[in-house]
């Protein structure tokens, strides 16, 4: 959530931010609502002050046995009580309208973020490795998976439905190896490994920005306040919701690997083949809670951490700085990491690393006690995929395929797999 002070002090910046993000959100009423909210709060404050004064006066006049004056003051007290009830009710209505708008306003992009309308205006920052070339007719990962019998699309559709997949045999072992590699690299870089519930409540989703705006993307559990988590960012960020941390404990760095669930609303027709876009998918996640002065340094470090996994696997990738029109709702600055996928003959997103500044922390009230000011301040939160594991699986299978239809196991995974290749079984 944005800082409310911007409504009064720099409304133009807010309007510009929404324009640059291609947002159609109407905030024209926000200034008047905020002003009315402030006026009502002043009335309530004045009434409470007056009520306290009258209460003291009543005690004095009771002591003087001036019943007439006591009755007059009690009538005045009753009038104030009625005013407070009416004003509080009006404030409740106004505050709800203000909160509805504030919860729908995306984070303000950092000044270093390029202004643009779509992914076409994202900026390439770096490339690593050379796109894989083959001297034979290479196959897409969905064909390799079927040929090597390491997964099953048809039976997953039978068991559940479209956009689901079953890993099996060496395919399941390869997925487990990718989870272990990503977690091992993350923990070696100071991240604390967590194992978390895959079900979260609405308060957690509101804190990280999925609710209320993106409810249609979620799988809700019927007749409850529970949802299947769309990303481990939700659980890891909310771990310290409504808590005050010691400054000396920062930064806090968490990692976890688990299943995630998204309805993929609005994605009809996109990546319909293979395991690139599914309703249920594996992901290893990074979340940082940091001192506000160090969040942009943390973003660079987090991105390098995610990239190091691709380098360990010797997979070509590039880093992209997202423009204002392509950024996530809660982010102030985002790098996408894209891995080379031969079946697409292009790079495909495998990670997003974002600095959310205090946007999520304000929603979730995660604070730290500043040792210099002795005041409680909001932490900055960051999150990043390290990595999207189904896409990483596809990248390994495609980039390491051989002419005979086998797959060479990347050196970094051999110790987890115990084999150096996956071959067709006769």
Curated annotation (Swiss-Prot):
Q: If you read the UniProt record, what top EC class would you report for this enzyme, in one word?
A: ligase
Q: Which InterPro entries match?
A: aa-tRNA-synt_IIb, aa-tRNA-synth_II, aa-tRNA-synth_II/BPL/LPL, Ser-tRNA-ligase_type_1, Ser-tRNA-synth_1_N, SerRS_1_N_sf, SerRS_core, tRNA-bd_arm
- Which residues of the sequence carry a binding annotation for L-serine? 231-233, 285, 385
Among its keywords, does the record have Protein transport?
no
Instruction: Report the Pfam families cross-referenced here.
Output: Seryl_tRNA_N, tRNA-synt_2b
Q: In which pathway does it act?
A: Aminoacyl-tRNA biosynthesis; selenocysteinyl-tRNA(Sec) biosynthesis; L-seryl-tRNA(Sec) from L-serine and tRNA(Sec): step 1/1
The catalytic activity, as recorded, is:
tRNA(Ser) + L-serine + ATP = L-seryl-tRNA(Ser) + AMP + diphosphate + H(+); tRNA(Sec) + L-serine + ATP = L-seryl-tRNA(Sec) + AMP + diphosphate + H(+)
Its Gene Ontology biological processes?
selenocysteine biosynthetic process; seryl-tRNA aminoacylation
Can you state the subunit structure given in the record? Answer: Homodimer. The tRNA molecule binds across the dimer.
Q: What does this protein do?
A: Catalyzes the attachment of serine to tRNA(Ser). Is also able to aminoacylate tRNA(Sec) with serine, to form the misacylated tRNA L-seryl-tRNA(Sec), which will be further converted into selenocysteinyl-tRNA(Sec).
Per the entry's comment, what about the domains?
Consists of two distinct domains, a catalytic core and a N-terminal extension that is involved in tRNA binding.
Please give the name of this protein. Serine--tRNA ligase
Q: Which organism is it from?
A: Malacoplasma penetrans (strain HF-2)
Q: What lineage is on file?
A: Bacteria, Bacillati, Mycoplasmatota, Mycoplasmoidales, Mycoplasmoidaceae
């Amino acid at each position: 959530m944005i800082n409310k002070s911007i409504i009064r002090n720099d409304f133009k910046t807010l309007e510009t931010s929404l324009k640059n993000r291609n947002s159609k959100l109407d905030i024209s009423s926000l200034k008047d609502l905020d002003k009315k909210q402030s006026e009502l709060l002043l009335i309530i404050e004045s009434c409470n002050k007056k009520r306290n004064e009258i209460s003291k006066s009543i005690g004095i006049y009771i002591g003087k046995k001036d019943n007439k004056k006591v009755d007059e003051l009690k009538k005045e007290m009753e009038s104030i009580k009625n005013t407070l009830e009416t004003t509080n009710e009006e404030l409740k209505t106004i505050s709800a309208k203000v909160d509805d708008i504030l919860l729908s306003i995306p984070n303000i992009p950092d000044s270093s973020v390029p202004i643009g309308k779509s992914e076409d205006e994202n900026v390439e920052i770096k490339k690593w490795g050379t796109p894989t070339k083959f001297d034979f007719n290479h196959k897409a990962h969905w064909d390799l998976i079927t040929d090597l019998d390491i997964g099953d699309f048809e039976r997953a559709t039978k068991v559940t439905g479209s956009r689901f997949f079953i890993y099996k045999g060496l395919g399941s072992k390869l997925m487990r190896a990718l989870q272990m590699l990503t977690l091992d690299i993350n923990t070696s870089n100071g991240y604390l490994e967590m194992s978390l519930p895959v079900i979260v409540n609405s308060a957690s989703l509101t804190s990280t920005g999925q609710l209320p705006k993106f409810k249609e993307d979620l799988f809700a559990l019927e007749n409850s306040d529970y949802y299947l988590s769309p990303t481990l960012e939700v659980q890891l960020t909310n771990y310290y919701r409504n808590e005050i941390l010691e400054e000396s404990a920062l930064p806090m760095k968490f990692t976890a690997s688990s299943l995630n669930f998204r309805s993929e609303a609005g994605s009809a027709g996109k990546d319909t083949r293979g395991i690139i876009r599914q309703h249920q998918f594996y992901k290893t996640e990074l979340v940082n809670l940091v001192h506000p002065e160090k969040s942009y340094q943390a973003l660079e470090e987090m991105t390098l951490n995610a990239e190091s996994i691709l380098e360990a696997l010797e997979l070509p990738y590039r880093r992209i700085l997202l423009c204002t029109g392509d950024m996530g709702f809660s982010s102030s600055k985002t790098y996408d990491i894209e891995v080379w996928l031969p079946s697409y003959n292009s790079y495909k997103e495998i990670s997003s690393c974002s600095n959310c500044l205090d946007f999520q922390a304000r929603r979730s009230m995660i604070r730290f006690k500043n040792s210099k000011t002795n005041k409680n301040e909001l932490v900055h939160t960051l999150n990043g995929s390290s990595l999207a594991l189904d896409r990483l699986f596809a990248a390994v299978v495609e980039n390491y395929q051989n002419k005979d239809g086998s797959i060479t196991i990347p050196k970094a995974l051999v110790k987890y797999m115990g084999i150096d290749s996956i071959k067709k079984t006769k």
